């Protein structure tokens, strides 16, 4: 994930502007190429454990939500969000999806995101917040890549425009 992000950042600095479609295609390709390595790491130690368990996942989620709350791309709907509830639901979702014991009881991804009318650019912006939050919390490239690829696997469920 960091390699792809740095490649796109370098392209922008060099005066090139990768399109949203190019960035999405790059993420999909990265996730496809790393699928076996990610599965092997998860089989050895579930991502839940490598993320540090429930408390650290909640702290990471709170940082993601904090970054979303100050992200200008999300101002248009942030006022209607209950941050505490969102942190709990996302933490439970991440815990469940990474091999932890929590049971996610929230809405499915299409239902939870449909009213937000997210574009591919919004998706990339949210993914950037996830990567920065994980870096802020000290996670390594493997864990960041795995979280990004989990998000990429759900892109068709949340991108609606």
What is the predicted role of each segment?
Residues 15-161:
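Core of compact, soluble alpha-helical bundle domains
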Residues 1-11:
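Bacterial N-terminal signal peptides
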